[in-house]
Amino acid sequence: MTNITHDFAVVGTDTGVGKTVVTAGLVGWLRNAGHDAQAVKPAQTGYPPDDDAEFVATACGTDAAATCGPRLEPALAPEIAADVADERIDYTAIFETCAAALDRDGPGVIEGIGGLRVPLADGKEVVDLVSELDVPTILVARSGLGTLNHTALSVEALRRRDVFVSGIVLNQFEGETAAERTNPRVLEEMTGCPVYTMPPLSIAKPEDAVAGVCEHLPVEQVLSSVERDPIE
């Protein structure tokens, strides 16, 4: 069994960048390698139909692969969604749900919600949760024009809170434009982080996410970088 035991978070520069697919792939790889890995979604909005924890669980073939905090119907940032839906969500409860997942024997994987500055609950943002849970991060970003600014600012926001960024995944990478072809090198120079690229995946069913991520990302290398958290 590969010796990868570190808890970590998969966060994004924005919504829709591919955090859930990357999370499913990494958790699936860990479980296939013999680890009792579990993803936790701090809160879910746009529910139904959106249910990222259910996607990860289905992709990994077991409900034990994922859990979720409060689910809210409006497709908005959690704190805003709760206000619109006239519901109450509690940051302490969300934190405790995530901390419980990290306290398990196997690796815990926090999946972010939208980007880092998304309002979560009680005036706290996603980046605050990641910082207070004290976990290293894998940052998922878009591949094309504009990602240099968004990604570098996200890395800066994490580092300001002493969060280790172990690597960047540029998702939906096709290399068809000059921006795509140069972004990986430039981002490595700007941030000092290793940058990985992942092409568009054909996902007809959730299980395809695990196979696709494992095929196109150097998963063991990505996860090994999480183990080298210099902040510890």
Curated annotation (Swiss-Prot):
Amino-acid positions noted as binding substrate in the UniProt annotation, renumbered to this chain? 45
Per the record, the major location class is cytoplasm
Name the catalytic site residues: 41
The residues that the entry says bind Mg(2+) are 20, 52, 111
Query: Transmembrane residues, as ranges?
Result: none
Location in the cell: Cytoplasm
KW Metal-binding (keyword) present? yes
Query: Is the keyword Zinc-finger in the record?
Result: no
Q: Which UniProt keywords apply?
A: ATP-binding, Biotin biosynthesis, Cytoplasm, Ligase, Magnesium, Metal-binding, Nucleotide-binding, Plasmid
BP GO annotations: biotin biosynthetic process
According to its UniProt record, in which pathway does this protein act?
A: Cofactor biosynthesis; biotin biosynthesis; biotin from 7,8-diaminononanoate: step 1/2
Q: Which Gene3D superfamilies match?
A: P-loop containing nucleotide triphosphate hydrolases
List, separated by semicolons, the cofactors it needs: Mg(2+)
Pfam families the UniProt entry points to: AAA_26
SUPFAM superfamilies attached here? P-loop containing nucleoside triphosphate hydrolases
Which purpose does this protein serve, as stated in its record? Answer: Catalyzes a mechanistically unusual reaction, the ATP-dependent insertion of CO2 between the N7 and N8 nitrogen atoms of 7,8-diaminopelargonic acid (DAPA, also called 7,8-diammoniononanoate) to form a ureido ring. This archaea does not encode bioA (which catalyzes the formation of the precursor for this reaction in the cannonical pathway), instead it encodes bioU, which replaces bioA and also performs the first half of the cannonical BioD reaction. Thus in this archaea BioD has a different substrate.
Q: How does it assemble?
A: Homodimer.
Query: To which protein family does this belong?
Result: Belongs to the dethiobiotin synthetase family.
**Protein name as it appears in the record:** ATP-dependent dethiobiotin synthetase BioD
Please report the organism this UniProt entry assigns to the protein. Answer: Haloferax mediterranei (strain ATCC 33500 / DSM 1411 / JCM 8866 / NBRC 14739 / NCIMB 2177 / R-4)
What high-level taxonomic lineage is stated for the organism? Archaea, Methanobacteriati, Methanobacteriota, Stenosarchaea group, Halobacteria
